[in-house]
């Protein structure tokens, strides 16, 4: 009698891991080591599968990053304190800061037209709730989104450079007050422009 011993293909092995497992592991690598070190090969090694097995769940790295972006942005709702434009901007910032290179992941995903528009939708809805037209709300929401992403990207780069001691002595630190000032400036400017006669 013969016993046939089969080999487990990468695709079959990947079924032991769900898309959620893959995404959660990728987020851990991102948080521990940064976006530059989040490679499909490294992720596969961490999951003990062949790199090709990851494509069972995500057809390419961009789709994986889009999933990570959605998860990062999705945290904003749970971090929201209060309501309104300023509260939404702060919650998004906190969500981005929760993961190393969070702003870069979300920004690059949105630039490629991938991922959920949840961040923009929430900011736009907050502006619209203050009585602005859909067109103005969308433009203001986009402006706020770009400010938050840019500010946090700068913050996160500064934190990394500080951690390895390469920031020039006497360089001005990035602080919460700078972020609050920027959001307030956009918010007040929006209301000021609406009150000016045409």
Predicted regions and their residues:
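Basic, helix-initiating cap at the start of DNA-binding domains
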Residues: 1-42, 46-48, 59-66
């Amino acid at each position: 009698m013969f016993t046939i011993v089969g080999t487990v293909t990468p695709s079959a092995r990947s079924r032991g891991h769900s898309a959620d497992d893959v995404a959660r592991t990728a987020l851990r690598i991102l948080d521990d080591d940064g976006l530059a070190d989040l490679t499909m090969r490294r992720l596969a090694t961490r999951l003990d599968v062949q790199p090709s097995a990851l494509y069972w769940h995500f057809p390419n790295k961009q789709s994986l990053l889009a999933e990570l972006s959605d998860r990062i942005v999705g945290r904003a709702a749970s971090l929201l304190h209060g309501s309104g434009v300023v509260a939404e901007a702060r919650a998004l910032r906190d969500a981005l800061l929760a993961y190393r290179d969070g702003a870069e992941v979300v920004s690059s995903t949105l630039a490629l037209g991938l991922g959920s528009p949840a961040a923009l939708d929430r900011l736009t809805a907050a502006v619209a709730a203050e009585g602005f037209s859909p067109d103005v709300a969308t433009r203001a929401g986009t402006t706020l989104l770009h400010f938050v992403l840019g500010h946090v990207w700068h913050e996160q780069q500064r934190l990394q450079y500080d951690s390895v001691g390469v920031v020039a002595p006497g360089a001005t630190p990035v602080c919460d007050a700078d972020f609050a000032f920027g959001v307030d400036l956009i918010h007040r400017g929006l209301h000021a422009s609406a009150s000016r006669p045409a």
